[in-house]
């Protein structure tokens, strides 16, 4: 005779079919959302629309191993044109780079050039990660291009990761982020700035030299970036301000400081703007 009490215990111990169905449904939903989140995270940090020429880790090694060059310091201006875009190309020779929130004195003859770098809002909030002499002012990886400065040396790169930013905080270096214009010889799929204005960029050549390039006339960001790519620059990041701010001293000592740049010194946000300063070593 079947043991009725044992059968009753087994029936009570089993889960109803509807309970199992709910558990499978919940597990499936969790798995789907987990995969979706993982894919989005991967696309955000890795699938950024352009290939990368130098990883942040390699740039860290390069920056840490840089040695002071021999020879005099100078910024040499050359002019050229490509794809109908007229360019001023500032070649940097053995300069000492720094990032500062104080616009330099143009009477200081050690200053060879300076220009604006990162953007900020009308309320003075920086857009993109910013580190000045080891002090982190802002953490924001929305912009893919970056520039890192340590011991007067400078590198640029393209990455969503902030490894280099953290390294600059630890090493009392400086760092800012900006829009990417060219990455590994490729243009990004789209640009977020529209209209025609005078443009400026910090770019790296195929033989690993850094230059600052400015347009001589108002250009769209796409036309400017395409001209940089066509000219042969491997990587390039945007510099805000164009020719409306900044200063340049020619090798013969002649200073160039436009009326627009002079007017900018009285801007209400003076003291907030981060400046890339290039000095004699």
What are these regions, as identified by a protein language model?
Residues 85-87, 144, 199, 271-275:
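Short hydrophobic/aromatic beta-strand or adjacent loop that forms the aromatic wall/cage
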Residues 97-99, 145-150, 202, 276:
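Broad, structure-driven detector of short, well-ordered beta-strand segments within folded domains
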Residues 115-116, 121-189:
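Active-site-adjacent helix-turn-beta-strand microarchitecture at beta-sheet edges
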Residues 1-140, 213:
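Zymogen propeptides
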Residues 173-213:
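Flexible, glycine-rich surface segments
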Residues 85-87, 152-153, 205-211:
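Beta-strand-turn-beta hairpins that frame and shape the catalytic cleft
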Residues 124-141, 192-195, 204, 208-235, ...:
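Conserved, well-ordered active-site substructure
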